[in-house]
């Protein structure tokens, strides 16, 4: 079984700041991390490898510094890693990114069939959840989104069964391979790399593919030229000036305090009392 895991290296969103004058993201000094949902995807691919054998290949599109993210994935147990890096990819939106990654996976399939493609459900910087489905569409793969757990894989029948988190419950889905899975935070925690994998990751000769090596003949479908979506502005929300209002009382009875708070609320929102009365009937 051959699984390809698409990951993204991005700035740690917990430490990102927006410049107060230019409204641009200040990346200086912000550490880079692997998109957390992509790590859940990697863990599921590695667990399938542990159970059924096979190969796990990790792919990322980004600048040369993304090599560190790939080596980290190798240290967890991935077998191979490909960095797709070219100035022509700069400014790619989700449409251009899915085009580029699907081309890379097609190139990989020239040497070895790909049974499963894993991505995180979305990245924490863009939150679009579009790249995974875009890859599946371009490769004509079955698509399973928002998967929380892989229940079973029948390698003989080439079928997979998963749990998909949906509003109000969990769906049990089954489809044929090959397919693409976008992973939620699952029931399995990310493993720690053992010493052998840590040393192997440090020595591993990464594949670095430019546009031509990835099999992309034209620049019209990648980068800014292939991106109909453009971010026009990034800004931090203005802080609200409103403050919480304190209701002072010397009455220690909780019921009386609650009634005082409700009276204040009904004064500010006259229709609210009527609405509550209707629902209580």
Swiss-Prot record:
One Pfam match:
ETF
Do the record's keywords include Disulfide bond? no
Q: List the disulfide bonds.
A: none
Coiled-coil boundaries: none
Q: Which UniProt keywords apply?
A: Electron transport, Nitrogen fixation, Transport
Keyword Transport annotated: yes
Which SMART domains is this protein grouped with?
A: ETF
Which terms under GO biological process does the entry name? nitrogen fixation
User: Which GO MF term does the entry hold, naming one?
Assistant: electron transfer activity
| CDD domains for the chain | ETF_beta
Task: Please describe the quaternary structure of this protein.
Answer: FixA and FixB form a heterodimer.
Q: What does this protein do?
A: May play a role in a redox process involved in nitrogen fixation.
Family, similarity comment: Belongs to the ETF beta-subunit/FixA family.
Q: Mind telling me what this protein is named?
A: Protein FixA
> What is the species listed in this Swiss-Prot or TrEMBL entry?
Azotobacter vinelandii
What is the name of the gene encoding this protein?
fixA
């Amino acid at each position: 079984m051959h699984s390809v895991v698409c990951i993204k290296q991005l700035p740690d969103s917990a430490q990102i700041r927006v410049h107060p004058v230019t409204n641009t993201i200040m990346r200086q000094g912000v550490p880079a991390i692997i998109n957390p949902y992509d790590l859940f995807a990697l863990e599921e691919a590695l667990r399938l490898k542990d159970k059924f054998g096979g190969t796990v290949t990790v792919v990322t599109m980004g600048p040369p510094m993304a090599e560190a993210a790939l080596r980290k994935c190798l240290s967890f147990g991935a077998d191979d890693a490909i960095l797709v890096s070219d100035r022509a990819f700069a400014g790619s939106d989700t449409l251009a990114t899915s085009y580029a990654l699907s081309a890379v996976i097609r190139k990989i399939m020239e040497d070895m069939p790909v049974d499963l493609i894993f991505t995180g459900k979305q990245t924490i910087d863009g939150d679009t959840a579009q790249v995974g489905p875009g890859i599946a569409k371009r490769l004509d793969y079955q698509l399973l989104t928002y998967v929380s757990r892989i229940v079973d894989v029948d390698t003989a029948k080439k079928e997979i069964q998963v749990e998909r988190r949906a509003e109000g419950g969990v769906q049990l889905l089954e489809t044929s391979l090959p397919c693409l899975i976008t992973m939620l935070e699952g029931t399995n925690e990310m493993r720690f790399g053992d010493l052998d994998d840590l040393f192997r990751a440090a020595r591993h000769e990464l594949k670095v593919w430019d546009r031509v090596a990835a099999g992309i003949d034209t620049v019209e479908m990648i980068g800014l030229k292939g991106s109909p979506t453009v971010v026009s502005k990034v800004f931090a929300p203005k802080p609200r000036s409103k403050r919480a209002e304190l209701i002072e009382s010397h009455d220690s009875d909780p019921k009386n305090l609650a009634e005082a708070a409700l009276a204040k609320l009904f004064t500010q929102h006259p229709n609210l009392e009527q609405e509550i009365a209707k629902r209580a009937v």
